[in-house]
Curated annotation (Swiss-Prot):
One GO-annotated biological process of the protein: DNA repair
Protein name, entry field: Holliday junction branch migration complex subunit RuvA
Keywords linked to the UniProt accession: Cytoplasm, DNA damage, DNA recombination, DNA repair, DNA-binding
Source organism (scientific name): Lachnoclostridium phytofermentans (strain ATCC 700394 / DSM 18823 / ISDg)
Domain I: annotated span: 1-64
Subcellular location per the Swiss-Prot or TrEMBL entry: Cytoplasm
Length: 203
């Protein structure tokens, strides 16, 4: 219904902002992580939005990019997690880190979000883990470095998986291992040992 709202940033509070669009002020709930990316009061801003409609009223939830909105929509499909719970999760952990945590089945990382215990975190992982693939976590890396090995993306995925497993065996958490390996730019002649070596430099 409301795909996005664009206008002047009129007010900023801890949990929400007010956007002035043609004389109408829209109250939009946002993750805390958005605050550091907001423009100055009076400047133009655009939020990709989700409209919650309930018997007792409506509420708008907004994000600065479509990726965060997409993750929010996935989170509210999990039984027991509503829009405000999803906002709380995305206030505590970024979309990228949340994707890594789900792939790594890292209950501890997800349960750091306010109001999310280990039981809910486990349920979230169970219901969303099939929504992501390892290549999703590395998609930004593929797009940014434009390095394609002779074996293709699939071969790189195999090398990455071996490096991740090695890091976990060394005692690093699965989430930290995923993030460290993601930061490595892989070229066609690299082995999993090379990726492991460069990944260790990211700790």
């Amino acid at each position: 219904m409301l795909a996005f709202i664009q206008g002047e940033l009129a007010e900023v509070k801890e949990n929400y902002v007010v956007v002035d669009n043609n004389g109408m002020g829209y109250e939009i709930f946002i993750p805390h992580t958005v605050h550091s990316y907001l423009p100055a009061i009076g400047d133009k801003v655009k939020f990709h939005t989700y409209l919650q409609v309930r018997e007792d009223g409506m509420a708008l939830f907004g994000f600065l990019n479509r990726e965060d909105l997409a993750m929010f929509k996935l989170l509210i499909t999990v039984n027991g997690i509503g829009p405000k719970g999803a906002i709380g999760i995305l206030s505590a952990i970024s979309t990228d880190d949340l994707r890594f945590a789900v792939l790594a089945e890292d209950v501890k990382a997800i349960s750091k979000a306010p109001g999310i215990g280990t039981k809910t975190a486990s349920k979230l992982i169970l219901e969303l883990k099939d929504k992501f693939k390892l290549e999703d976590a590395f998609e930004a890396t593929f797009q940014s470095n434009q390095v394609i090995s002779t074996g293709g993306k699939g071969n790189n995925d195999g090398i990455r998986e071996e490096a991740i497993q090695a890091l976990v065996a060394l005692g690093y958490s699965a989430t930290d291992a995923l993030k460290a390996v993601k930061a490595v730019e892989i070229t066609s002649n690299m082995t999993s040992e090379d990726v492991l070596k460069f990944s260790l430099r990211n700790f």
